[in-house]
Design a protein with these regions (language model features):
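Glycine-rich, basic loop-to-helix element that forms the pyrophosphate-binding segment
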Residues: 69-85, 314-324
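Conserved donor NDP-sugar-binding/catalytic core segment of glycosyltransferases
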Residues: 104-134, 330, 356-365
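Conserved nucleotide-sugar donor-binding catalytic segment
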Residues: 143-225
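Conserved core of the sugar-phosphate nucleotidyltransferase
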Residues: 319, 323, 334, 343-432
Length: 467
């Protein structure tokens, strides 16, 4: 027998912070794997519950290494694990989740068979606090070329990665404290091949205290990650913003919320965008032109007279946008159509839409919210669910994406050729629930007015309609 023990093939690490109630299940799911060539690092991030006692009981197991540390947060801990790991492959298991018995065997087998492959991730089950399966996450098949747009990241945990590739890209970015999987995905997919397994190989726990429930923080962090990588790529994101206005006495352009005019607020918000170089207000209503007179000193806010025949309710905007693109679109890379109906959209949403389009190389992009509802059509004999969505539980149904937020952007060269705003490969940017609130009725006005009043009084400038 050799005096030198070979390094294990896989380094599994469990990160734990105050998850004593789930921790044993997670650790045991590693120790009972069908594949045995692994080491297990258990990293406790300064827990104050019974975690240390539970972890200590595994101290005599030769496969287990234990690291206790003061609270450092997830991304710092991920990098500590990478430095401590000796395996050819590395995989994280969160302390509130657990593996299927063949998880390590399946994922390492895929990587062993494909030396150029850098990352593999499986489908997974959703479970509740009592280990009841409440749904399944099913991904499109990377191996069968179902995936050509890499804008849906792998889960941050239970994804197996080739350790030397992970080191080459510098590990995890410690300036972010959540969305580690997304940040890594952006970096990793730029240089290495990734694939998935169609089998569910871990159990992901949905409960009130886990991070994924804080949607607004997640979306803001994703936007910051996108911005960071776009800054590195130095792409030309110059954008011409178009606000289409039909006009008429009841038009939103003439209305106010808490004393702030809706059109003025929208223009001022766009003027603060990193990428918007010109703002074109397009309307058949000549009063709108007078209304924007205060901006005349700014060379970048201009009026475009829109033919009345192109401003009817059922007419699409393509002819108008083509005219604007020809007249005002010199030297810009993108066209963005921004509607007035969504007053809680902020400049960060606009910038993130442009960044997302550039980062994933799509031709156009639209702002959306995922929607898991069941929709019906009337077929003359009663209601029928669309896409057989009644056959699935809520968590199994693949989300439909609902266009909300009033942001559509397209690369100018793509639009000039196709004369369609949503053209070529269409990307999406998810906006938060507040930003998706639109003005379509008196009740909407009341709700948005209340939100902005509350935010003005608590001085939360993020959701005040920008003046």
């Amino acid at each position: 027998e050799s005096l030198f023990k070979m390094s294990p093939l896989i380094s599994v690490y469990i990160t734990n912070y105050n998850y004593a109630r789930f921790l044993k299940k997670a650790i045991d799911s590693v120790l009972s794997q069908s594949f045995h060539d692994y080491e297990l690092l258990i990293i406790d991030d300064g827990s104050t519950d019974d975690s240390k006692k539970i972890i200590g009981s595994y101290g005599s197991n030769p496969k287990v290494k234990i690291i206790y540390q003061h609270n450092k947060g997830l991304n710092v801990t991920n990098n500590i694990a990478i430095r401590a790991a000796v395996g050819k492959y590395i995989i994280r298991l969160d302390a509130d989740d657990y593996f299927a018995a063949n998880a390590l065997e399946q994922m390492s087998g895929k990587l062993e068979a494909n030396p150029e492959l850098g990352m593999v991730f499986p489908n997974y089950y959703y479970i509740d606090e009592k280990d009841q399966v409440i749904g399944e996450e099913i991904r499109h098949d990377f191996d069968n070329n179902e995936v050509s747009l890499l804008d849906q990241p792998a889960h941050g945990a239970c994804t197996m990665i080739r350790t030397d590739f992970l080191n080459k890209i510098g590990g995890y970015d410690e300036s972010f404290n959540c969305q580690d999987g997304y940040e890594l995905w952006i970096k990793f997919t730029q240089g290495y091949k990734v694939t998935n397994l169609k089998e569910p190989l871990f159990y992901y726990r949905k409960h009130g205290s886990n991070l994924t429930s804080n949607e607004e923080m997640i979306l803001q962090t994703r936007a910051k990650i996108n911005q960071k990588y776009i800054n590195k790529l130095q792409t030309n994101n110059s954008t011409l913003a178009i606000i289409p206005i039909r006009g008429g006495d009841k038009d939103l352009a003439f209305q106010t919320i808490n004393g702030v005019n809706i059109l003025t607020a929208k223009i001022n918000m766009l003027l603060r965008s990193t990428y918007v170089e010109k703002i074109i207000i397009s309307s058949p209503d000549s009063r709108i032109e007078k209304y924007i007179t205060p901006y005349k000193t700014k060379k970048n806010v201009l009026f475009h007279f829109r033919n009345e025949t192109e401003a009817r309710i059922n007419d699409n905007l393509n002819a108008t946008i083509f005219d604007i693109s020809n007249k005002f679109g010199n030297n810009v890379a993108n066209l963005a159509i921004i509607t007035l109906e969504y007053p809680l959209i902020r400049r960060e949403h606009i910038d993130d839409a442009i960044n997302t389009m550039a980062l994933f190389g799509t031709d156009s992009i639209v702002s959306v919210r995922p929607d898991n509802a069941i929709f019906y059509q009337h077929h003359g004999d009663g209601l029928h669910p669309i896409l057989n969505r009644d056959k699935f539980t809520k968590l199994e149904r693949e989300a439909l994406f609902k266009q909300l937020g009033g942001i559509t952007a397209v690369r100018k060269v793509v639009f000039d050729e196709s004369k369609q705003t949503l053209s070529g490969r269409v990307g999406h940017v998810v906006i938060d629930q507040k930003a998706a609130l639109g003005l379509f009725s008196n009740i909407d006005f009341e709700i948005i007015s209340d939100i902005t009043k509350k935010n003005q009084s608590s001085n939360k400038t993020n959701d005040v309609i920008e003046q």
